[in-house]
């Protein structure tokens, strides 16, 4: 009987060790009291870029409320424009976009906290090959 318990204990121990090895690293999301509304504009000319960026930003915890095409379609790099000074999501959004191109354009009539102008280096940001 004690041999049986020993085998059962060993089995549980091995199962516990193997399940620990298979655990994936969870991404740590920065929680904000207000996610902020974000506008995404396709400024690179790549078909479906705004939809892909919307999906990526939503997976990162941002509330994308508007997507559309920009009049200009020749941006090489992604640009982040902040409309609300002091918005707590600014740093997290810039980090998610992997950009240092951040402009502050205060607009009291803006209905979003930030606008994202997608550049041609979109794939480097969202790490997808399906574009």
Predicted regions and their residues:
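Extracytoplasmic/periplasm-facing segments of secreted or lipoprotein envelope proteins
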Residues: 30-74
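Bacterial N-terminal signal peptides that target proteins for export
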Residues: 1-8
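C-terminal motif of bacterial Sec signal peptides marking the signal peptidase cleavage site
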Residues: 16-19
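BRCT (BRCA1 C-terminal) domain core and associated BRCT-interaction motifs
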Residues: 64-118, 123
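Short, solvent-exposed mixed-charge patches
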Residues: 129-131
């Amino acid at each position: 009987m004690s041999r049986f318990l020993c085998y059962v204990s060993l089995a549980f121990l091995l199962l516990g060790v193997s399940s620990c090895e298979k655990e994936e690293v969870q991404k740590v999301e920065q929680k904000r009291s207000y996610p902020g509304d974000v506008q995404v504009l396709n400024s690179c000319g790549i078909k479906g870029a705004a939809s892909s960026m919307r999906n990526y930003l939503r997976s990162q915890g941002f509330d994308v409320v508007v997507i559309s095409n920009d009049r200009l379609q020749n941006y090489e790099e992604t640009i982040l424009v902040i409309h609300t000074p002091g918005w707590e999501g600014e740093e997290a959004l810039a980090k998610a976009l992997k950009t240092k191109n951040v402009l502050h354009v205060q607009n009291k009539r803006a209905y979003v906290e930030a606008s994202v102008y997608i550049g041609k280096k979109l794939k480097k940001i969202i790490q997808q090959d399906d574009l």
